[in-house]
């Protein structure tokens, strides 16, 4: 298993947890364009994204990921705060 920290600050948080078969984003707190630049992957290559809470530096492009077909997991409260439920 591999853990990568690609962005970690109040301006955005993005981490990747992966193994040979699975690639998961932890947090998506940057723009969709920046997320593509940071990861170096097509976002369709991610199996899922986990968002811890609604602050933009953790959830910035959650709606875009969902629209693009990525499974994004979060609490019901976070989804409500982001207007996604």
Residue ranges, per PLM feature:
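Active-site metal-binding motif and surrounding structural segment of the metallo-beta-lactamase
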Residues: 31-78
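Short, conserved SAM-binding/catalytic segment
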Residues: 85
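A short, active-site helix/loop in glycosyltransferases that binds the activated sugar's phosphate group
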Residues: 80-82
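Conserved beta-strand hairpin/beta-sheet module of binuclear metal-dependent hydrolase folds
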Residues: 1-39
């Amino acid at each position: 298993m591999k853990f990568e920290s690609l962005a970690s600050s109040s301006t955005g948080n993005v981490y990747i947890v992966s193994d040979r078969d699975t690639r998961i984003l932890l947090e998506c707190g940057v723009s969709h364009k920046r997320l593509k630049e940071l990861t170096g992957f097509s976002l369709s290559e991610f199996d899922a994204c986990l968002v811890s809470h609604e602050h933009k530096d953790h959830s910035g492009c959650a709606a875009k990921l969902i629209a693009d077909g990525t499974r994004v997991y979060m609490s019901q409260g976070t989804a409500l705060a982001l207007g996604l439920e």
